[in-house]
């Protein structure tokens, strides 16, 4: 658009552009207009008048300004998360759905074909769901279903003591959403993969679908969730600190150094400096974020990159207050894991430590013991 146009011609040009865009799109787009048009008061007021009407609805705006044309559509409004027609595992376990026809989606974890009857095990985010295929009843051909395919299954929920979680779905239909291009390179349906670390990493998107492999991420989630929930309950404020800096927060030479637009920079070892700064603002702060340490090592107890759970608190009487807060976190989180992550604990075969009473020993006493 030529901004040298006089005000009246410019307004006509803008009106024409708005009409064209209203006829083809669901909203108003002024991206193509140069900033120079704001120098013309009439054009600016017209744009302002148009923009002020957008929240009130597309139709009112069109009528007021005489905008019309074929192909116009009413502006659609997004009102939030839609209720899904498909059920999750937690929904299937409810008493009221037993005997009801339901829809579930998921990935085919494995198929056990017994002839006239087959068990199609679906893998969902909450765990495994057993589906029962009956030849001549289920309404589809089992040969069309492949392991690792994603499907939408329809069937009747029934109790079954031998099925995972005590329920199964007696299939009435199945819609294939996607199919694998080739057989899976790893036996992900096995309890343990029993393959090399190299193979697991080479096929990481596949190996992580194994129940034991993915359970570790759920435990990690529980630890971080417990940290956040507990500290929120204790009046802490969550902060987010920079990870690229000019200097380290803790000092030392073990830093990952990088070029930051031709200036030297480092990856932060710790948010300590920022935590101390924000204690003066909120009294109690915490952060869950990655930290980086350029330390060569040959043990499993050292990591160059990990997720650090940091908190800082003011107005304390001594370090014992910090120890008490840490103990409170451990107690809260271990109970959370036992309650909300029991399946993952069982799959991994781990035992949650008891945290009711944690011994507190002085450093000089520890040195004598070792």
Predicted segments with their positions:
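Short, Lys/Arg-enriched N-terminal segments with co-localized hydrophobic residues
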Residues: 55-74
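Class II aminoacyl-tRNA synthetase catalytic cores and aaRS-like
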Residues: 71-370
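Hydrophobic alpha-helical signal peptides and transmembrane signal-/tail-anchor segments
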Residues: 27-31, 38, 43-46
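Intrinsic low-complexity, disordered N-terminal segments enriched in polar/charged/small residues
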Residues: 7-9, 29
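N-terminal amphipathic/hydrophobic targeting modules at extreme N-termini
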Residues: 16-19, 35-36, 41-42, 54
């Amino acid at each position: 658009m030529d901004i040298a146009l006089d005000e009246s011609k410019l307004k006509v040009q803008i009106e024409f552009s708005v009409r064209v865009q209203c006829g083809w799109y669901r909203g108003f787009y002024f991206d193509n207009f140069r900033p120079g048009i704001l120098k013309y008061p009439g054009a600016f007021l017209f744009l302002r008048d148009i923009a002020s009407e957008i929240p009130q609805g597309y139709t009112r705006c069109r009528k007021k300004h005489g905008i019309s044309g074929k192909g116009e559509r009413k502006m659609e409004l997004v009102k939030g998360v839609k209720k899904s027609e498909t059920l999750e595992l937690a929904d299937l376990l409810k008493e009221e759905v037993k005997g009801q026809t339901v829809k579930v989606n998921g990935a085919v974890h494995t198929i056990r074909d017994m002839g006239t009857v087959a068990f199609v095990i679906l893998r969902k985010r909450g765990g495994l769901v057993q589906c029962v295929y009956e030849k001549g009843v289920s309404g589809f051909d089992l040969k069309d279903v492949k392991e690792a395919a994603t499907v939408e299954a329809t069937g009747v929920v029934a109790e079954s003591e031998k099925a995972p979680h005590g329920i199964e779905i007696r299939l009435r239909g199945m819609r294939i959403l996607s199919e694998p291009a080739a057989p899976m390179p790893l036996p992900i349906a096995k309890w343990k993969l029993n393959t090399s670390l190299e193979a697991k990493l080479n096929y990481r998107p596949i190996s992580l679908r194994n129940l034991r492999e993915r359970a570790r991420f759920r435990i990690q989630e529980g630890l971080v969730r417990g940290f956040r929930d507990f500290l929120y309950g204790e009046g802490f404020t969550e902060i987010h600190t920079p990870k690229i800096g000019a200097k380290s927060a803790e000092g030392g030479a073990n830093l990952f150094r990088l070029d930051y637009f031709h200036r030297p920079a480092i990856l932060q070892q710790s948010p300590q400096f920022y935590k101390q700064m924000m204690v003066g603002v909120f009294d109690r702060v915490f952060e869950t974020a990655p930290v980086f340490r350029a330390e060569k090592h040959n043990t499993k107890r050292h990591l160059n990159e990990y997720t650090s759970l940091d908190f800082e608190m003011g107005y304390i009487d001594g370090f014992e207050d910090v120890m008490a807060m840490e103990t409170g976190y451990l107690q809260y989180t271990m109970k959370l894991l036992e309650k909300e992550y029991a399946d993952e604990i069982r799959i991994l075969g781990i035992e949650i430590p008891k945290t009711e009473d944690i011994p507190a020993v002085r450093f000089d006493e520890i040195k004598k013991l070792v």
